[in-house]
Amino acid sequence: MNKNEYMMHLLARTIRTRNDDMITPLITQLADMQVSMDILEKHNFPALVAEYAPFNKAAQSLSHSVLVWKNDELAQEKSYMLKEFVRICKDQHQPEEFLLRLTCSLINLNDFELTRSCFDIIVSFGLTLNAYDEFGIFRKAMEYQGQMEEADKIISDVDAMLLRNEFLEEDEAEEQADNEMDAFEEEGVEEVDQEVVDFNDNESVISETESGVFTDEELDMEDHAEVMRRHAQDQALVSEICMVFLAGCIKSGRSDVISAAIQFTGAFFYPLALLRKYDIQYLIYCYGSHNEDAELLMNHIKHLQAIEIAGERQEFFKMFMETTFRNAETVTDSVMAQMKGFLEDGDDFMISCTLHVFLKMPITLSQFKNSHVEACLENLESGLAAQLGFMLKMKIQLLEQIDYEIW
């Protein structure tokens, strides 16, 4: 662990103390430090600040800087991402139900470029009038009439279908008069259809090739690997679009929309890096903390993050203990706050080491009381940590007795 990584761990833990007197000076101290986005992303600082230091100006400034940085990167990726999404959808001869619903839902996020791309896709899908009505596509296209060619094309297509339906209704009477002739012709068609079915059964390889599906026998291993690679890339890009949709729905603040988006996108199955990239945890704090599904997703993200940095937390703890207590004769209040954090979220090793320090060092009663260490001791149920915790309780009680006798 290098110095930058160590200091970012220290900053993250300091923000969790909720202590403005510790948070502000440390952020000021680190203001000129050059830190990579990967390290900042790892600690999810916007979400940390939203939860633990929402009113601290220095922390708010840090969060804002990180969000601006990330949004700039997302903006640079957006054009390529939308172009590829359009390609993926248009490559399908028949749109998948999921992609159809995703595309039709994205137009409601009020993002001009995103809506333009989705209208372009929708035109290629060749939807029915019922679909245009069910997904509210025509109504949305009317909002952009004259502003984008894709919206005008949808309006034109719908008008043409409506006109065609009028002609069909006028011809309905004539069609009814020819029912007997139609029934006779259908008998002949059934025989022809059966022959076509038999032909398709015998020429299944041709039908598969025409639909864009190739068997392993038709492809050599390199071609097959390339197809699989492209498929994986396409799936990854669709996942990015899903995160755009989920983020937009959370920003709406509407509980029903948030729950529906979490369920529709399968948000719990996406990798941590993608959830962090689109600041899903941060957005939940800002717009969706009132929603049970969003809260479950937020806790899920926290769990994934704890697993990811578990090894680094161990390394940070060892470095912190070594640098803090190498020649220390006393324990400062800020160190007490950090140590209490190890009691709250540390593993057995961290907790035991922390309790050893509390037993060994000359810590005052007021320091124990102000840091609320005793509350953490109640959660120690068994093992070495529980034994050390009992000993620390005895130490605190002894300090209380001495303090009482003095007064």
Swiss-Prot record:
Expression tissues: In the embryo, expressed in newly arisen somatic blastomeres.
Major subcellular location class: nucleus
Subcellular location(s) per record: Nucleus; Cytoplasm
Record's keyword annotation contains Hydrolase: no
GO (cellular component) term, any one: cytoplasm
Alphabetical list of Pfam families matching this protein: Pes-10 (PF07149)
Keywords, alphabetical: Cytoplasm, Nucleus
Keyword Cytoplasm belongs to the record: yes
Signal peptide span: none
Family note: Belongs to the Pes-10 family.
Protein name: Patterned expression site protein 10
Organism for this UniProt entry: Caenorhabditis elegans
